[in-house]
Amino acid sequence: MSAEAACSDDSFGPWAGATCRGGFDFTLLFEETILSILPSVLVIVVAPIPIIRLAREPPKVRASALDWFKKISSICFITLSAALVGLWARNSTITQTRASTPSAVLTFVLSLVYVLLSTIEHRLSLRPSSVLSFYLGLSVLFDIARTRTLFMLEDATHSAIPPVFASSLALRVVMLLLESTEKRSLLLAKYDNAAPESVGGPYNLGVFYWLSTLFFTGYRKILEIGDLYPLDDELRSTGLAKKMSDAWRKVPDKAAPNVLFATWLKTFSKAMFMPVVPRLFQIGFTYAQPFLITAAIELAATPQTQPYNNNGYGLIGAYILVYSGIAVSVGQYEWRNYRAATMMRGSIIPLVYEKSLILDSCSSATFHPTAALTLVSTDIETITSGLVQIHETWSNLVEIGLAIYLLERQLGAACVMSVGFAIVVMVGTVFLARPTGTHLAAWIQASQVRVIETSKALASIKWLKISGLTDVAFSVIQKLRKQELVVSEKFRYLLGLSLILSICTPILGPLLTFAVFAGIAAHGGSTLTIAKVFTAFSIIVLLNSPLAKIVQALPQISGSIASFQRIQDHLNAEERHDPRSTTTGTSPESNNGSQQTLSDKQATADGDTMISISGKFSWRSETPAPGTGITLVTGSDEGHLADTTPDANGDSRDAPVIDISPRLDIPRGALTLILGPVGCGKSTLLKALLGELSSFDGVIEAKYSGAVTYCDQNPWLPNETVRDIIRGRSATDTSDADSSEKADHDEDWYRVVVSACELQRDMQIWPRGDRTPVGSKGISMSGGQKQRLSIARAVYARRALVILDDVFSGLDANTEDVVFENLLGNSGILRKANMTVVLASSDVRRVPFADKIVLLNQHGQVQHTGTPGDLKQVAELGWADRDLDAQQEKPGKDELNHEHGEYSESAPEKLRRSQTNHGADNNAAVQEVLQAVESQADTARQMGDSAVYKFYVKSAGWLTITIFVIAICVYAFCDSFPSVWLKWWAEANEKNPNSDLGKWLGVYAVLGVGAVAACLIGTWQLFIITINRSGLYFHNLLVETVSRAPMMFHSTTDTGITVNRFSQDLQLIDMELPSAALGVVMALSFGIAQFILVCVSSRYMAALLPFLLAVLYAIQHFYLRTARQLRLLDIEYKAPLYTQLMETISGVVTIRAFRWETQSTEKAIRILDTSQKPSYLLFCVQRWITFAVNMVIMMLAVILIVLTTTLREAIGPGYVGIALSNILAFSATMQATITSWVTLEIALGAVARIRSFSMQVRSEDDEARDGLAKAGLDARLVQPTPETVGERWPSQGRIELDNVTASYPSSGRVLHNITMIIEPGQKVAICGRTGSGKSSLFLSLLGLIAQDSGSITIDSVDLATLPREYLRSQIVAVPQEAYILDGTVRLNADPYHNKETLGSTDPPDSRDEQIIDVLKRVGLWEKIATRGGLDMVIDDKFLSQGQAQLMVLARAMLRRDESRVLLLDEATSSLDEATTTLIDEIVSTWFKDWTVLAIAHKLDAILDYDRVAVLDAGRLVEYDQPRELLQRPTSIFKELYLLSTNQASLSSPDSN
């Protein structure tokens, strides 16, 4: 018989037979149909898709030699294909089949399609053709086999077909190289910034070669954000947000459960489908492994001769193909999964941000200033974790089905035990998934509450420190942290239970399966063989992996869906509906011309009325806190505590806050002054004019369109430079005018505005002028500077309507008068521009300048309207004790300035001292320190720090971690050793079938139970004990660091960065780190055990250990240099996004007034895109290391099969089974190790940040010690004891300042040689213009700014030697801004005596009586008593600004027996006359024997003080009795007093 006859080449095969071509070849028919016709048909069918898609695309590359080479090679391909068609058609000399000619014809047709597709994709696509690259790669691989076959045919030497076919193969190799060549250097200029994955070919993307530049850059240098690749267009948030927003808008029922999740899946179905194909390939390659193990064991049992050696060579090729396929498919599957997750982040966060801009700010049920922060941080991270697990559900079910089928083939009915266990685990997991998701949502909610309270405290840290409330406020936060961990325990219990369920199957499943099989075999006459044992064991390993993944995936998916629902609830929250209507019946917001110019508005407006309002508004009733009877609302308006108090007839929560009847008209081009007592609803009325009161019951008719300028009572200042704040979003204005002319005009206007708002002097002092950042919430600015910046922004915007909410109250008298005159005087720029101004105030001094007066009474009703001359009765009001007639008789400001021109112009200039270079030098020094710290941090960022691991272990406790590690090692041993036990059992069965079953099964059972018990102990130690300990440890460390940090830290560090530590960093430590640590320790333990078994099975493999360790070390070293940096960049660049969100929400009323919603959203999206770059690239490099490690495993598997092929007689099938089954398990273990390790690295980044933060941020006391050492004194601070400071310090209140000089590190010296003595019981007022150093002197007494020289003593105790927090706890200070704790009235009134028992509801009755008495004295008790009394839970939204100030004063009053020094920082600046008088009376009587220092702007109230200190430019220029100073003709205090009281002349103090 001839070889051709023995080959059966015309049959499908695929094997050609043992006697055909050495027994190692395919049949010709198989090769021509499967290896030729099938790929050709697929390409011909698929090719039209990219051709149609690219048809309308513009050209993207310029002409090049590459294009010509492709065309030449395509023509050669057509020629050779045509030649092969002719040769096969006329062939009579070589063996052929019925598919030979069709195969050649299809190849020729394909060559024609190839030319068209290659040309189009080269010109119109950024990347190489995926279709052609895949085809050419497969074609080359397949045609190598076909070429071998053709040359091995007996009659091949007489035919031209083999050489022509070989030439075609060689040509396709060249074509593959040409088609795979990337075109970045050929791209047109506008595509130069295309992302690497946008221009990468399939092979580049498949092996992640496109990341190599990033890796080398990160290895060589410290990565900066500019070094990272640009985002792929598909990942840019602008397009993603629009796509998702459009889809969400079309959803009919937005309240349906989980409809947001369903909508997102539908909208981004393509992105979610992309991982499906690589996942299917991964399943195929994975489940090829049991067949390879079976073939290898069978090969090991054969002699080392031909043809068995050929089988071994084929097996080597199969192992290369399968394990390489696993590496590529796993990498591509995970990469595409995380691309989808990145798209989710880019599409959902803008939705949350945009919704936050339109929420109803007057409803707490729908709005909280920082609630959205948790949604875009914790919830988004939770969604990401769950989203990447979605494909694990269906794919693992497929894997489980395949494993069960394969297991049944090996063990028959005995597989029921594994199947049964799988069903039990799946049912249990599904049963646990919902409560797990629910408890995770509860944990996130508890975390949100804590983060909100933390953000609030950090935003007011200055006022907390001044008040000595730092410990109290942060102890509330620490209590919330403990509650959060208690809430999280339920979730952690369920997570641990799910884990135990998942490990029971791989441990107990095989035990019961083999036990049942052994029982059946004993009665059926069969037995366990080595091949059957290890094939079944490998299948069970494969069965366990998807089971474990499902158990892990379902809770994560459930948590992801719960977080989607939380975001959905936010998106469904009640929106603000503008109740205003224009004269055409539409809302002012309907006009898109938010940048309409002033002249345009005036030209289109009609009549003399700008806006009209009539109706009522009541704060809507929300669900009150139990027993409080009080409504939670949001807004900075006054009066809604006072005005919603139940009256005698019952609950009046729906009583109107404002009642405007009859109609109130705001005249156009005039100044309308709204007057009224504290808490009367002035701010609420302004909110109504802005359209902020959605539930306003009445009519608001706006006879204008477009934006309004608005200054809130509490200025909204984002953390930007002074210049950017003043210019606002005006840079985005569009105009037909020449841009350079417009820029010049804007610059001229900018200078005018700066001058009008008296900011030029401040800019000269600030180290960077108008480029100086203001800090979070303007923390680095004084109160007056913040107000003037807010006013300047409003003026700069040049809108027709200007609404000002008590904006002059924070300014000193001189500055207030000058700014008011510059803006609203007879020649003021707002007057000249004929702007309509509405000013709310409690100060009647501005009455003479108003065109219209609106007088509100205490119940929010319009008591009177008219001109200043009509309001004689205002003098009869209890809240305005000034004589209005006298006010109206005062000269205008022009006259005042003229008469006192010597002071307003010359006197201040004489007093101004040129600032030294101290500030600049200090600033440079700070920069050097910061650069040094940054350099140190950068080194750690790149190289890593093993101390971080020790730091985390320390937080949990060494004993806890030791028990955990030992337990996991025991678990690994008990779970790995059964493979050896099974080998011994199978070998024993070959000698004595089915004997000693009790021994074999008994030991197996002991190992299984031991594994479960050890895992249970380890899980408990980690998930319960470790999280509780480390969670409290790291939070307390952050609290301690932040609360003790100096003010300089808070003024220069963005609040969002610090909040990020309390939110994302702690979330990573709580949620990610323990699971990742468990995965890493488990995987390492199992990996070591499995590799030991592999080495025991094949001693030659042990020789690879040094090589393996070296390769793995090199990979991780190369990877970590970049990954660590990306991890930290990811965390760092998420902080600005959180800051932007917090700033936007806190200033949403201002943003909506100015119509800056679009600009704010665009800015947020830019920040989001920046944060996406390190986040996405971190995901990518993690996929790279997964791919790299899988390739290492491929090499190990190939080496092992090579050893099996060449040394199989020495190894034996038993050890081959152990080695290969453990290589299979080792592969899964290494994948798990990498997955857990990269997560652990991210989480440990949070630990490293906290560690670095706690080490680098020095405490106030540390800086105090440095100051003492610098002065040559003992650097130890005094420990406050009766022996060191006295029994009750300060007991007298004598204050002495001796040559005190102080400075801020960032802005230079602020106090110069201040010397003054204040005797016990004296009352001293500190006055001066804004920025003169009043607040700096105040802060120096509290140890909040650095003292360069001199000393401050109180009762002979040097303040520099005292711990800073102790100092502030002993001095009673009332700050300029009040801080209201979220808690009961009792806690707020008397927080200092609740430190040890926060939350206690049963304090002594006597103390309650004292609290009530004090609240009565300040006028708050009547409003509180009917709402729950001292047990009423309040927050900062329940009190108007004035009422909150009274609450702070009540705190001070309750400390009457604890100190003798009272500091008042402009405590009455925002109060009406009656309330100011009340506070003055309390200070003079309640604190009669105290030493009082008061910063004052209202100078008529301090004439009875003992002394007045006048500061200017940080120098003490006058210090004497106020009435004595008023007698001096050249007294600066006299000039300030005249301006403060609007008096043109002053004959004697007694006349006032």
UniProtKB/Swiss-Prot annotation:
PROSITE patterns membership: ABC_TM1F (PS50929), ABC_TRANSPORTER_1 (PS00211), ABC_TRANSPORTER_2 (PS50893)
Keyword Disulfide bond set for record: no
TM helices/strands, residue ranges: 32-52, 68-88, 100-120, 158-178, 280-300, 311-331, 413-433, 457-477, 500-520, 528-548, 957-977, 1005-1025, 1076-1096, 1100-1120, 1184-1204, 1210-1230
Membrane topology: Multi-pass membrane protein
Keywords: ATP-binding, Cell membrane, Glycoprotein, Membrane, Nucleotide-binding, Repeat, Transmembrane, Transmembrane helix, Transport
MF terms in GO: ABC-type transporter activity; ATP binding; ATP hydrolysis activity
Biased composition (Polar residues): 581-602
Subcellular location field: Cell membrane
UniProt biased composition (Basic and acidic residues): 887-912
Record's GO cellular component terms: plasma membrane
Broad class of the protein's primary localization: membrane
InterPro entries assigned: AAA+_ATPase, ABC1_TM_dom, ABC1_TM_sf, ABC_transporter-like_ATP-bd, ABC_transporter-like_CS, ABC_transporter_C-like, ABCC_6TM_D1, ABCC_6TM_D2
Pfam families: ABC_membrane (PF00664), ABC_tran (PF00005), TMD0_ABC (PF24357)
Keyword Transmembrane: yes
Glycosylation site positions: 91, 592, 719, 834, 1028, 1299, 1313
Domain ABC transporter: 639-884, 1295-1538
Function: ABC multidrug transporter; part of the gene cluster that mediates the biosynthesis of the lipopeptide antibiotics leucinostatins that show extensive biological activities, including antimalarial, antiviral, antibacterial, antifungal, and antitumor activities, as well as phytotoxic. May be involved in the efflux of leucinostatins.
Similarity comment: Belongs to the ABC transporter superfamily. ABCC family. Conjugate transporter (TC 3.A.1.208) subfamily.
The protein's name: ABC multidrug transporter lscH
Organism annotation: Purpureocillium lilacinum
